[in-house]
Amino acid sequence: MFTATELLDKINSHIADLQFERTPKGLYDPVAYVLSMGGKRIRPVLMLMAYNLYKEDVRPVFSPATGIEVYHNYTLLHDDLMDRADKRRGKETVHKVWNDNTAILSGDAMLVLAYQFMAQCPAEHLKAVMDLFSLTALEICEGQQMDMDFEQRSDVKEEEYLEMIRLKTSVLLAASLKIGALLGGASAEDAERLYDFGMNMGVAFQLKDDLLDVYGDTAVFLSLIHI
């Protein structure tokens, strides 16, 4: 079984080797730029870890793991545009390097690419994987809209906030684990347990993230916040 660090190295190498050879370059250069920014790669590593619980050779899951990371970065690209953020991981955001329209269109392309990568899995698991991935993508949109709605309210209840972070953050971590388990041949019970674990982990991460955003010294905690 591989360590998390070993799996991180593997998926980083795989993503670094991606070639976007289609044209126009004005669409695909921002995609390559976003993926070159790095990051913790938590979601693909979780998928590989879950798969590795059941299968030794993790290479068959590189494409779906790449899909989950491309999807995550697509959401960040559009988040940065909506928030008018100038920096992401210490580098200028896509709408600053290029423009708003390019950020929208390249983000859309990343969403399609994420589905293409995710679909590169064995036929016997394709429907279950794509159903879960599609539901997760929709739930993330719902969570983002809730977050935007809450910015206009001063009466947000605790249960509403928890539901928002479940949708906005937790479901993708949970899906990463469950997809890895399904592809590895896990039982339905095991896959669901890993999903629940990912859900709880995501809530814990987002609670910490939000606390640091409110109370943390950015100079000290920048490397800790955001997953």
Placement of each model-derived feature along the sequence:
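Mg2+-dependent prenyl diphosphate-binding active-site environment of isoprenoid biosynthetic enzymes
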Residues: 16, 20-225
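N-terminal amphipathic/basic leader segments beginning at the initiator methionine
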Residues: 1-18
